[in-house]
Amino acid sequence: MTIRVLVAKVGLDGHDRGIKVVARLLRDAGMEVVYTGLFQTPETVAIAAIQEDVDVVGLSMLSGAHLTLAPMVVETLRAKGSDIPVVVGGIVPNNDLEDMRAAGVAAVFGPGASADDMVASINEVVSRARA
């Protein structure tokens, strides 16, 4: 079964080159990708994820707001009755990883994460969610 991924930029971060590269590599790995574009809110991401019936949400975070915005996306999904897992890629300091996981983020990809590692991790996250 093809994995469906929604990728989004939440908040005011206008840098989209990285998320477009990630979207392409996920497509090349056989995943179906929905890109919501820039300047999304946790609410719009959650609604789109549910409407698109995706298996996982990927957030690109470069603005330093990851400890605020990523948990808000997770909370909004849960409030809407969805258990879609959320993964985050971008600039996330190592000392924030535990807080991200505690907030319900399933995986975090920092600078230098390889395409193979991202694909393998997303496959694993989705496999756990489908089990």
Model-derived features: where do they sit?
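N-terminal pre-triad scaffold of radical SAM enzymes
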Residues: 8-12
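Cofactor-cradling patches in redox/metallo enzymes
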Residues: 19-123, 127-128
